Regions:
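Selected alpha-helical membrane-embedding segments in polytopic membrane proteins
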Residues: 1-127
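Hydrophobic alpha-helical transmembrane segments and adjacent short intramembrane/lumenal linkers
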Residues: 112-178
Length: 178
């Protein structure tokens, strides 16, 4: 377990040597896939939590907005809020998560393929598909920082976390591909 902590800390510190160590072991490919899939599922749940909290906030503060809008717009806004709440309360949510997971897995596979093609054709780097997959998977570890979203109701903090972890994940990917 201590070794796993060291790996995670090195990734957060943008240590590009850790990616070389991880990519040299082909057995890390399955771990990278698991990190990627669970990270995207975690991000999806965090985004849904953010949307649900935003709807609750909007519903509670609709009175502040109503005074400046025409009645037809207010009715449309109330209908939209109810429709979104029905999606969260229905069985459609599980289907949405499954389709999100499948789509994110396919987009990740395509992204790894594009990165591999760019590295081998454009940058003329000697690499293989699994190494790029390992780097891509492990660079998604910062996504797990979105877990804070489940414990806070602050909309600005949730926005900051979602955007911040997305940017930090891209920075980690760039550090790993260096």
């Amino acid at each position: 377990m201590g070794n796993n902590r060291q790996v995670i800390l090195k990734i957060f510190r943008l240590d590009n040597n850790i990616y070389n160590e991880l990519a040299s072991e082909i057995t890390n490919f399955q771990i990278a896939i698991a990190i990627y899939v669970s990270g995207f599922l975690f991000s999806g749940l965090a985004a849904l939590s953010f949307l649900r909290n935003s709807l609750v906030y909007l519903e509670q503060n609709i009175g502040l907005i109503v005074g400046t809008l025409p009645a037809q717009t207010v009715n449309e806004l109330n209908n939209l809020i109810r429709e979104f709440q029905n999606v969260f309360d229905s069985q459609q949510l599980f289907g949405l998560l499954i389709s999100y997971l499948i789509t994110s897995f396919l987009s990740g596979f395509i992204t790894v393929g594009l990165i591999y093609l760019l590295l081998t054709r454009f940058f003329r780097k000697e690499t293989n598909f699994r190494q790029v997959g390992i780097i891509y998977g492990f660079s998604n570890i910062p996504v797990f920082l979105n877990g804070i979203i489940f414990f806070t109701n602050s909309i600005p903090l949730q926005i900051f976390l979602i955007i911040g972890t997305a940017i930090f994940t891209l920075v980690c990917l760039g550090s790993g591909l260096k």
